[in-house]
């Protein structure tokens, strides 16, 4: 199969807002690829915006200057995948030049449509509305299977592409079960506006836990073998010896647990998230980092113990099993209550300890691997900033034809200009998209038919964010975490926008 077929399908999927049409287009492509398991795996990964190789060391810098496109499609899907694998294996002296040469060779053989697809895929910008449920439905349609069967296999296998390859080759998906050593998708939380809201949504009584601002880890132990996975299912065992040692100290043979790795100060207050995140880098000197930035691990759920799966067990039963196994120093603080005052006090104490909020877990909730359910709710304070829109990108998928992803700038009193601190396309309603498309045309600087439209720095926008982290991507050295639009501020002049110092104060 040619890369051209995948690129055209991606364009078609991005061009329609109809879920049924998206599913049908992807299913048709997968049906053509079946029963070739390698081909199916690659296509599902790519159209989900991911690479089977996960990381290949190619960033935007390597994609800035591209050769002219090829006149006719000739690249095959498997051939491109092989090239990407080769790029990902390069390391050491001269590898950057080799990587650049292979990228140039690949793009010179790609047509304009194929270049666009590869550019967005490698840059992490393939927003076409085909992730998650839509892709699972497409796999189910192509394989002639119930969507729930595909979703469960993907959930327990931790990989929709693997489930798709099995289903489209005629293999039974009921063989996908929780297996020690094979990561599964983590359960995710919805948001509650307050502890009172969480109590109401959980029927009056719930279990509150401290929400640590660390890194989610999934811990697998089979006898004396331990594997540690991130929330994106990357294996980081070698980078986290402290987590391995804490797991081996538990009186258990086989284990699958959910937890948080976090760097703490000497007084047990959390370090900035960036300190914890630095321990997960692929090139980190583990011994040196451990000496200067040691990690602690806190377990908060247990999914399997010594031959017994606990996914279907209620929260209370899983926590009882956790408490019987893990010492208190390795568990998060917890409160079971129906009293809003007690819940509010617990939240206040958690925030005072330096943590980011609380989780509320319904006592009867099952562990919904890979899904965002109401059984878990997160409650945390929200920071807001008034920033200036510096540029905007054209949308894709449902937002095709709309100016969508906005570039955000903080005011720099020293220069009188603005410093970019992030981007976001989150939180925008349809009405807001319509309004800003018109508004940004009015304040555009230069042409508006390119991917990025530059703007006069006149429009103030209020954004909510979860915090700030260090970043070399932006000139201010900082980036917003999980920024989303609250509203546009017609009542505010750019001179009233928050300064870069206000952003730094949140770090």
UniProtKB/Swiss-Prot annotation:
Tell me which domain of life the UniProt entry assigns to the organism this sequence originates from. Answer: Bacteria
Q: Which UniProt keywords apply?
A: ATP-binding, Cell cycle, Cell division, DNA damage, DNA recombination, DNA repair, DNA replication, Ligase, Magnesium, Metal-binding, Nucleotide-binding
User: Which co-factor is required?
Assistant: Mg(2+)
Task: Specify which residues bind ATP according to the UniProt entry for this protein.
Answer: 209, 216, 231, 260, 300, 372, 378
Region annotation Not required for adenylyltransferase activity, required for nick joining: where it falls in the sequence: 1-172
Listed under GO biological process in this entry are: cell division; DNA biosynthetic process; DNA recombination; DNA repair; DNA replication
Return the Pfam families for the record: DNA_ligase_A_C, DNA_ligase_A_M, DNA_ligase_A_N
Database matches in InterPro entries: ATP-dep_DNA_ligase, DNA_ligae_ATP-dep_bac/arc, DNA_ligase_ATP-dep, DNA_ligase_ATP-dep_C, DNA_ligase_ATP-dep_cent, DNA_ligase_ATP-dep_CS, DNA_ligase_ATP-dep_N, DNA_ligase_N_sf
Family per record: Belongs to the ATP-dependent DNA ligase family.
Show the HAMAP family listed in the entry.
Answer: DNA_ligase (MF_00407)
> Could you identify this protein by its name?
DNA ligase B
- Could you tell me which species this protein originates from? Mycobacterium tuberculosis (strain CDC 1551 / Oshkosh)
Q: Which gene encodes it?
A: ligB
């Amino acid at each position: 199969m040619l890369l051209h077929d995948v690129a055209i399908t991606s364009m078609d999927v991005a061009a329609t807002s109809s879920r049924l049409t998206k599913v049908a287009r992807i299913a048709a492509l997968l049906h053509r690829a079946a029963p070739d398991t390698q081909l199916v795996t690659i296509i599902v990964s790519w159209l989900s915006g991911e690479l089977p190789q996960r990381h290949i060391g190619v960033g935007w810098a390597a994609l800035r200057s591209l050769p002219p496109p090829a006149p006719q499609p000739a690249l095959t899907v498997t051939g491109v995948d092989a090239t990407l694998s080769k790029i990902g294996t390069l390391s050491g002296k001269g590898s950057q030049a080799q990587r650049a040469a292979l990228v140039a060779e690949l793009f010179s053989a790609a047509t304009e449509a194929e270049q666009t697809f590869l550019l967005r895929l490698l840059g992490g910008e393939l927003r076409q509305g085909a992730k998650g449920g839509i892709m699972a439905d497409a796999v189910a349609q192509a394989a002639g299977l119930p969507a729930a069967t595909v979703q469960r296999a993907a959930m327990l296998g931790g990989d929709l592409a693997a489930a798709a390859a099995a289903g489209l080759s005629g293999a039974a998906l009921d063989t996908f079960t929780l297996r020690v050593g094979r990561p599964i998708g983590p359960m995710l939380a919805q948001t509650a506006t307050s502890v009172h809201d969480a109590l109401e949504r959980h029927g009056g009584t719930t279990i509150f836990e401290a929400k640590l601002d660390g890194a989610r880890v999934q811990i697998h132990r089979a006898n004396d073998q331990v594997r540690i996975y991130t929330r994106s299912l990357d294996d980081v065992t070698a980078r986290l010896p402290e987590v391995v040692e804490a797991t081996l100290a538990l009186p258990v043979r086989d284990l699958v647990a959910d937890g948080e790795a976090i760097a703490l100060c000497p007084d047990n207050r959390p370090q900035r998230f960036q300190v914890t995140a630095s321990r997960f880098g692929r090139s980190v000197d583990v011994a040196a980092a451990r000496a200067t930035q040691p990690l602690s691990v806190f377990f908060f759920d247990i999914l399997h113990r010594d031959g017994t799966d606990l996914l279907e067990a209620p929260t209370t039963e899983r926590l009882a099993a956790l408490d019987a196994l893990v010492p208190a120093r390795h568990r998060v603080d917890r409160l079971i209550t129906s009293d809003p005052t007690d819940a509010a006090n617990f939240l206040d104490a958690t925030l005072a300890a330096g943590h980011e909020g609380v989780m509320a877990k319904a006592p009867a909730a099952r562990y919904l691997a890979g899904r965002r359910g109401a059984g878990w709710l997160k409650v945390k304070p929200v920071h807001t900033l008034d920033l200036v829109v510096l540029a905007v990108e054209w949308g894709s998928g449902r937002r095709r034809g709309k100016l969508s992803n906005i570039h955000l700038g903080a005011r720099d009193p020293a220069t009188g200009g603005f410093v970019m601190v992030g981007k976001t396309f989150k939180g925008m309603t349809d009405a807001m998209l319509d309004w800003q498309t018109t508004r940004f045309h009015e304040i555009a600087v230069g042409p508006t038919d390119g991917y990025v439209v530059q703007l006069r720095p006149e429009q103030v926008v209020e954004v909510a964010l979860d915090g700030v982290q260090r970043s070399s991507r932006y000139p201010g050295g900082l980036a917003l975490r999980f920024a989303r639009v609250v509203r546009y501020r017609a009542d505010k002049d750019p001179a009233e926008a928050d300064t870069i110092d206000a952003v730094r104060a949140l770090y």
